[in-house]
Amino acid sequence: MADEGKEETGMGQVEEDFSVWKKNTPFLYDLLISHPLEWPSLTVHWVPSTPNPYVADSYFGVHKLILGTHTSGSAQDFLMVADVVTPTPNAEPGIGGANQDPFIPKVEIRQRIRVDGEVNRARCMPQKPTLVGAKTSGCEVFLFDYAKHAAKSQTSECDPDLRLVGHDKEGYGLSWSPFKEGYLLSGSQDQKICLWDVSATPQDKVLNAMFVYEGHESAIADVSWHMKNENLFGSAGEDGRLVIWDTRTNQMQHQVKVHEREVNYLSFNPFNEWVLATASSDSTVALFDLRKLNAPLHVMSSHEGEVFQVEWDPNHETVLASSGEDRRLMVWDLNRVGEEQLEIELDAEDGPPELLFSHGGHKAKISDFAWNKNEPWVIASVAEDNSLQVWQMAESIYRDEEDAEDIKEDITQQS
């Protein structure tokens, strides 16, 4: 009975937090789309291609999102492609905000591709955006070219273009090389990292791993290619370790215990070759320099509970975001580390100065989020409450950051 009371109190707090957030949305966001999904999605990913113009209104563009279903065996699972309509940068101020025209379709599921098991993670190949790698609750990684599949599955079976084999258990880690077309990394609970070249010739639509890396002492939570060096990638494990691998030698270059608890995610900075970030179950996000991994450069600890994901902003070198079991998606600006709190801001109660924004629109744990490279400051996030949200914080919140970058650029050009 005591547990039931605690659960009811917890749900009451969730509803109260959501109500406060909803009341403040007109002041916090320049864009906010909230779309209920039939089933929760564990994954969300922007298709890395230029948005198409929206036929009915040139002030809007159509982006594509990759989603999945998590039905827990209650229904057929699908990999999904959705259209998301957002205002273009040329749109008049206010378009897309809280008072956006309700008749403009915001999110529409355009394609459902049948898969075996729920989609743990799905990511598009950067060099061929219609090619999607999907890790499910099975051992195989599926490869689908959604351009070749009908809007609705014509078959009652999962029919991927390729089945990638090499794992013994399911997992979440998945990363396409930004440099080598077709190179796909996967990390799973079997403590293995598999590397495939999907351009290799398969046998009956089945492709074996080109190489299998082993070195972690427990499940691998995430893998990620380095953004500047085509030969390096990193892996994060439930053993608290960060491992940097070199594909030229197929050996570990570094292995360091960076957290006392699980490392759930890692992200290499797309601008600075030495900097990476990790998200951990110890409730922190940590920044590291690859040249000195024995101690973090900086630790951010505003999350309450485990942190499951961290991603650098592809458009701003010092900005990154993180999400955790506290239902919050936090955006950080490292330019503000060490700044004094201003009285006009809500002071230290709002967290450290580098905490730029905290998105509170989900009522349950956030499963995945993604920055939109084509639309600066736009993020898509999905949660266990079946919600998909596409949002952009108000310009007044991040303007200082962009002004600082412009000044820095002017100084560089003049010198």
From Swiss-Prot:
It comes from Arabidopsis thaliana (Mouse-ear cress). GO terms for cellular component: Cul4-RING E3 ubiquitin ligase complex; nucleus. Belongs to the WD repeat RBAP46/RBAP48/MSI1 family. PANTHER family: WD40 REPEAT FAMILY. WD repeats lie at residues 166-206, 215-255, 258-298, 302-342, 361-401. The keyword Nucleus applies. Core histone-binding subunit that may target chromatin assembly factors, chromatin remodeling factors and histone deacetylases to their histone substrates in a manner that is regulated by nucleosomal DNA. Signal peptide: none annotated. It is found in: Nucleus. Its main location: nucleus. One of its GO terms (biological process) is chromatin organization. The keyword Transmembrane helix does not apply. Keywords: Chromatin regulator, Nucleus, Repeat, Repressor, Transcription, Transcription regulation, WD repeat. This is WD-40 repeat-containing protein MSI2. A motif (DWD box) lies at residues 232-248. The DWD box is required for interaction with DDB1A.
